[in-house]
Curated annotation (Swiss-Prot):
<keyword id="KW-0812">Transmembrane</keyword>
<feature type="transmembrane region" description="Helical">
    <location>
        <begin position="5"/>
        <end position="27"/>
    </location>
</feature>
<dbReference type="GO" id="GO:0016020">
    <property type="term" value="C:membrane"/>
</dbReference>
<protein>
    <recommendedName>
        <fullName>Uncharacterized protein MJ1285</fullName>
    </recommendedName>
</protein>
<keyword id="KW-0472">Membrane</keyword>
<keyword id="KW-1133">Transmembrane helix</keyword>
Amino acid sequence: MELDYLLATAMFLIVCVYVISETVNLHSVYDIEEAKKEFLMYYNDLKYNYSISKGDLIFNFKVNKIGYVIEGFVFKDTSESRELIKYLENLNGSYIIAYSPSKDEFIITKNHEFLRIIGHYNISAKYKKGEYGDIEIIYPKNYSINYREFQGISCNKLFEVPFYIVDKNENITLKYYGILEVGR
């Protein structure tokens, strides 16, 4: 009887520790709404105040002292987006600018792999073949990319959360696909 009591107490304590640790992890990782707000704030800053020194704000930002990495942007071909592309090309930055004629969308990224998986990624992390098969590299010039197929993209639910953002302010539609990667 006493052994049963000790065993039940030990199991209860183990479950409590597990639940508390998972709650702490989820609280810091799934603060996605805050991350989206922060991302849109930086995007608006980029539109109006872009400079070389601030350039990394496109790709890195912090929310509640947690560092996030943005893999890239996808946005519709509009007059304002073409101006932004022209401006970025002239800065000679360390990023890749691509265009998809079939989707009529621009893509900006620092990650070569991102061009290979962009459009093949949805919320359930399932592979979707050929959505961006016609990507043309605009910048840097004479740059090419070899595509490879992904059978699936794994997503560690505690640390990496795929999501997208649509910003319809001022007649611009900006979509962001990628991973919020929490510093480990």
